[in-house]
From Swiss-Prot:
<feature type="transmembrane region" description="Helical; Name=4">
    <location>
        <begin position="200"/>
        <end position="219"/>
    </location>
</feature>
<comment type="function">
    <text>Mitochondrial iron transporter that specifically mediates iron uptake in developing erythroid cells, thereby playing an essential role in heme biosynthesis.</text>
</comment>
<dbReference type="GO" id="GO:0005739">
    <property type="term" value="C:mitochondrion"/>
</dbReference>
<dbReference type="GO" id="GO:0048250">
    <property type="term" value="P:iron import into the mitochondrion"/>
</dbReference>
<feature type="transmembrane region" description="Helical; Name=2">
    <location>
        <begin position="106"/>
        <end position="125"/>
    </location>
</feature>
<keyword id="KW-0677">Repeat</keyword>
<keyword id="KW-0999">Mitochondrion inner membrane</keyword>
<comment type="similarity">
    <text>Belongs to the mitochondrial carrier (TC 2.A.29) family.</text>
</comment>
<feature type="transmembrane region" description="Helical; Name=6">
    <location>
        <begin position="301"/>
        <end position="320"/>
    </location>
</feature>
<keyword id="KW-0472">Membrane</keyword>
<dbReference type="Pfam" id="PF00153">
    <property type="entry name" value="Mito_carr"/>
</dbReference>
<keyword id="KW-0410">Iron transport</keyword>
<keyword id="KW-0812">Transmembrane</keyword>
<protein>
    <recommendedName>
        <fullName>Mitoferrin-1</fullName>
    </recommendedName>
</protein>
<feature type="transmembrane region" description="Helical; Name=3">
    <location>
        <begin position="143"/>
        <end position="162"/>
    </location>
</feature>
<keyword id="KW-0406">Ion transport</keyword>
<keyword id="KW-1133">Transmembrane helix</keyword>
């Protein structure tokens, strides 16, 4: 099947995806096609969910080693053997001293969480965005609608991903007591209870709602600049996704540091802060970070976070847009009369 967006067949499908019926008249703008985003009802919820699941799995799988380094770099009281100055140096040291596969420990948990989480995330975003754009900006693309839609999608996404985040971050830490995802889940459940899997949920939302608002608004804005006709354009999706992710990541690093502390419950850090038991709550996490490392503590791992998020969101958007285009194209071709 020819998938090039410039082919005659693809252009015809793109017009149908955009609601442009050449023989029916309606749905065309001055250029002969409407926005790629304005898919007809044939772009079903299942299409968005399938494309979203594929995007989430590939994004987190490819970038997982960098995510492991980011988690360690955000440690407030790292072991002397786990202090790193660069991502490359960290990965090299981890593989040399802890084993070649060590940076991938916990990736199975992330894949199991990322698939359903991103499926709901993109499906919710697409439908909320379309509904809110009709309310706020009937004839165009409202950045307010994009931000709100991204925030609402985050509520569903984080409800699924938070337990996976807790488990994978504990597996990622240096000298982790947990040797497998199952043993980690059992230990946390037995010693800390079910609530431990959602201890950082409010912090996660406090971080991810502004992150995703910035992310979606920036992505949609950049798409308007580099891809104004909203055709399927892989290069534009990669550029817009990467820049949007980098900006959102840098702006929300302080919240990510607090989330990591709540997820990992670093014993050394809590002891230095004279905290007994378990740390909970965003305000307490912020105070603890400042107490131990000052203002600089809020930006621990910012380099790794930006380097992780930039290709991560580029992968996510390019994969998502490809599968959305591919699946809708297949649906339309299957319905076309021969």
């Amino acid at each position: 099947m020819e998938l090039r967006s410039g082919s005659v067949g693809s252009q015809a499908v793109a017009r149908r995806m955009d609601g442009d019926s050449r023989d029916g008249g309606g749905g065309k703008d001055a250029t002969g096609s409407e926005d790629y985003e304005n898919l007809p009802t044939s772009a079903s919820v299942s299409t968005h969910m399938t494309a979203g699941a594929m995007a989430g799995i590939l994004e987190h799988s490819v970038m997982y080693p960098v995510d492991s380094v980011k988690t360690r770099m955000q440690s407030l009281s790292p072991d002397p053997k786990a202090q790193y100055t660069s991502i490359y140096g960290a990965l090299k040291k981890i593989m040399r001293t802890e084993g070649f596969w060590r940076p991938l420990r916990g990736v199975n948990v992330m894949i199991m969480g990322a698939g359903p989480a991103h499926a709901m995330y993109f499906a919710c975003y697409e439908n909320m965005k379309r509904t809110l754009n009709d309310v706020f900006h009937h004839q165009g693309n409202s950045h307010l609608a994009n931000g709100i839609a991204g925030s609402m999608a985050t509520l569903l996404h984080d409800a699924v991903m938070n337990p996976a985040e807790v488990v994978k971050q504990r597996l990622q830490m240096y000298n982790s007591q947990h040797r497998s995802a199952i043993s980690c889940i059992r230990t946390v459940w037995r010693t800390e209870g079910l609530g431990a899997f959602y201890r950082s949920y409010t912090t996660q939302l406090t971080m991810n709602i502004p992150f995703q608002s910035i992310h979606f608004i920036t992505y949609e804005f950049l798409q308007e600049q580099v891809n104004p006709h909203r055709t399927y354009n892989p290069q534009s999706h990669i550029i817009s996704g990467g820049l949007a992710g980098a900006l959102a990541a840098a702006a929300t690093t302080p919240l990510d540091v607090c989330k990591t502390l709540l997820n990992t419950q670093e014993n050394v850090a809590l002891s230095l802060a004279n905290i007994s038991g378990r740390l909970s709550g965003m305000a307490n996490a912020f105070r603890t970070v400042y107490q131990l490392n000052g203002l600089a503590g809020y930006f621990k791992g910012i380099q790794a976070r930006v380097i992780y998020q930039m290709p991560s969101t580029a992968i996510s958007w390019s994969v998502y847009e490809f599968f959305k285009y591919f699946l809708t194209k297949r649906q339309l071709e299957n319905r076309a009369p021969y």
